[in-house]
Amino acid sequence: MTGAKTNQVDQRPLSITDLLHFIPYDLQQTFLFEAILSYGKIYNLYPIKWVFLIALALFEIGSLICGAAPSSVGLIMGRVVAGIGSGGLFAGAILLVAEFKPLNERAFYNGMLGAMYSVASVAGPLMGGAFTERVTWRLCFYINLPLGVVTAVIVFLLVPNNYDSGRDSRRGLPLKKKLQEMDLYGLVVLVPTIICILLATQWGGTKYSWGNARIIALFVVGFVLFVAFVVIEIWQGDRAIVPPSLVKRRTVWACSIFSFCLFGSFLVVAYFLPLWFQAIKGDTATESGIHNLPSILGTTIFSVAAGGMVFGLGYYTWACILGSVLAAVGAGLLSTLEVDSNAAKWIGYQVLYGAGCGFGLNQPLIAIQAALPDFQKSEGTAVVIFMQTFGGTIAIAVAQNVFNNKLVSNILAAGIPVDPAALLSVGATKLQGLVQPQFFGRLQLAYNDSITQTFYVAVATAGLSMAGSILIPWLSVKQAVAPEDAETANTVMPFQHPSSDVDLAMPAILRQSGEIASEDSQSSDIEKVPRNNEVSTYDSQTSEVEKSSVGSTNRKVESIRN
């Protein structure tokens, strides 16, 4: 359970600042971002099973260090180790499913994975708050140990050792060549880039004004470093940690935009809605978790339901679009919450918002599986998860700025005799003790307005996610091929039946018969025969398939199959 962050090694209850800093800039977060992209390469170079188990071991070691930390330095180091390990866990789980299940069945299983991920994102911090208040903050980390052991035993016993040994030819490279494949130059430049961006978004408007020289300098340096990172990636080519050939794909960048925005919206609601229950309804951390169940259940149920519907219909783009719409509407309704809002409102709004996130959050990972060939799936998965995580971090930082600034201005405008800094440093459940009884009603109104303002950030990011969702190609997960350029070779109109196996195999058939020029005369045409004797056609966007008669085609199909 990494959601609960403890800024000081003590037994005090979580303050508002603590809660807002569950996903802030710190050393662990930077290493987490680095690790996510690194694992995209590592999973291509080494067997998925063993990489996953090593990542899990690092996460467990980091959790143990955090739980036993005698000082803040030890806690930070433990978080770094845990972050390096956790960066490979979700991507590894997705890739393990991809290895054992055909494309059309992955939607359902990935839906269940996404549901558990969403539940953990919401429930983890709330459980951490309860542990901190009632037991000890160390339990936030110790609880990971038995759960990790059970996971490791299951993976070790049930996943074969050499099931994916032929997945990527680069696995046979010597260690020196594998290190060159890791794009160390890009990784080194990416670290300060992330630090500058996160510091600027976290400090701007709170610790320093947006026009402060420090904030401007951070943005300028971050931009320059980002440009340098892009240049390095272009120079590295396919060795890059984010290969340019991958970024050029419409599915990858559209899914990245969608994931960045929708997950950012999801985390804003996940972390500020419990504050509303604690400050406005007087809940404890545990009670706010119970009142947050409609959101958790909505996300979980509709994530699994969306996976089943994608499995049945064959398409996932519709779920992304619907998810964006429902999430934006749900977040908008949450922004209307008042001090006296009844249970029917906050339950209904949560269910609607949870449905939107459930429908949409997991679909980009299905899109990556459908649109990319095997050798790019791990890198594509890592890029989408990176953008998802980074989007959540940026959205939380922006929402925190909105909350802090609005609360201070509301306190001053209402003439409430309380120090805003002191208000931000105590727990949301301790508000009543800060002011005299006659001022508490005004304080609640100020607090309610400040929290609901953060939901506008969730509305905006959910709305922006629609730009990505409508650009995701309509591909079918029911087709038996995974072309390298599926976005053009295998795109059909929504809800049409997929092409027959003869139609899908046409490019390979014609090439083998000599009716289409060889690879040397075409623009990046690649052919690959995947597992289970499936015919896979890889067509570039510029190549065109020549027509042939049905009778001739059928004879060639039979000849090839025999």
From Swiss-Prot:
Q: Which residues are glycosylated?
A: N448
- Disordered: annotated segments: 515-562
- GO CC list: plasma membrane
As for membrane topology, the entry says:
Multi-pass membrane protein
> Per its UniProt record, what PANTHER family does this chain match?
MAJOR FACILITATOR SUPERFAMILY, MFS EFFLUX TRANSPORTER INPD-RELATED
UniProtKB keywords: Cell membrane, Glycoprotein, Membrane, Transmembrane, Transmembrane helix, Transport
Assigned protein family: Belongs to the major facilitator superfamily. TCR/Tet family.
| This protein's name | MFS-type efflux pump elcC
Q: Which PROSITE patterns match?
A: MFS (PS50850), SUGAR_TRANSPORT_2 (PS00217)
Q: Where is the composition biased (Polar residues)?
A: 533-554
Is DNA repair given among the entry's keywords? no
Key word Membrane present = yes
MF term (GO), any: transmembrane transporter activity
Which cellular compartments is it found in?
A: Cell membrane
The induction comment states: Expression is up-regulated during the late stage of P.nodorum wheat leaf infection and is controlled by the cluster specific transporter elcR.
The membrane spanning regions, by residue number, are 50-70, 80-100, 111-131, 139-159, 184-204, 215-235, 257-277, 288-308, 309-329, 351-371, 383-403, 455-475
Q: Which GO terms describe its biological process?
A: transmembrane transport
Role of this protein: MFS-type efflux pump; part of the gene cluster that mediates the biosynthesis of elsinochrome C, a perelyenequinone phytotoxin structurally similar to cercosporin.
Which InterPro entries would you find in this protein's record?
Answer: MFS, MFS_dom, MFS_trans_sf, Sugar_transporter_CS
